């Protein structure tokens, strides 16, 4: 929507929509999404997907989100900066989707909400930067900013998606 009103100059070639008798509203904003997710509540399922498939979930979800009326989303974490790459592709016009703000990788303590360690000893931390203490946390913040993060997401408590840290467990202190 460029302009709304009763009278104004319309540039030649512009599309004019007569919305008389209708309600016109701005696009919606979703403030907490994981755009590259396949929607499975078990986040560990993504461990079985090749990186390209995770990126394609992001592109697919971006189109569906825009088609649903959301013109901006705040992604809250995706593996390896995929949401930041998707954001750039949308800005360049090579992908369709809403405007995206994204944090890069989530910052979590060892064993914390975004530490995707598996009891077999395998660790999948493409989605997070494990940071214990202020020095490591500052370094992780700098890495995210270097990679283009719009904001920093730090898991300060446990969460509902992680098996070993209840939601009321403090994980960082000031």
How would you describe each model-predicted region?
Residues 10, 79, 158:
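Flexible, active-site-proximal loop/turn residues at the rims of small-molecule/cofactor binding pockets
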């Amino acid at each position: 929507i460029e302009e709304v009103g009763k009278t104004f100059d319309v540039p030649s070639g512009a599309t004019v929509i007569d919305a008389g008798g209708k309600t016109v509203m701005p696009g919606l904003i979703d403030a907490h999404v994981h755009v590259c997710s396949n929607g499975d509540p078990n986040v560990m399922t993504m461990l079985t997907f090749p990186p390209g498939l995770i990126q394609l979930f992001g592109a697919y979800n971006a189109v569906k989100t825009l088609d649903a009326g959301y013109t901006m989303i705040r992604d809250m974490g995706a593996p390896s900066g995929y949401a930041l790459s998707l954001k750039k592709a949308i800005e360049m016009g090579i992908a369709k989707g809403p405007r995206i703000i994204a944090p890069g990788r989530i910052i979590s303590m060892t064993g914390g909400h975004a530490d995707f360690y598996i009891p077999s000893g395998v660790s999948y931390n493409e989605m997070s930067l494990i940071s214990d203490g202020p020095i490591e946390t500052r370094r992780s913040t700098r890495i995210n900013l270097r990679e283009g993060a719009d904001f920093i997401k730090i898991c300060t408590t446990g969460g509902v998606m992680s098996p070993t840290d209840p939601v009321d467990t403090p994980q960082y202190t000031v």
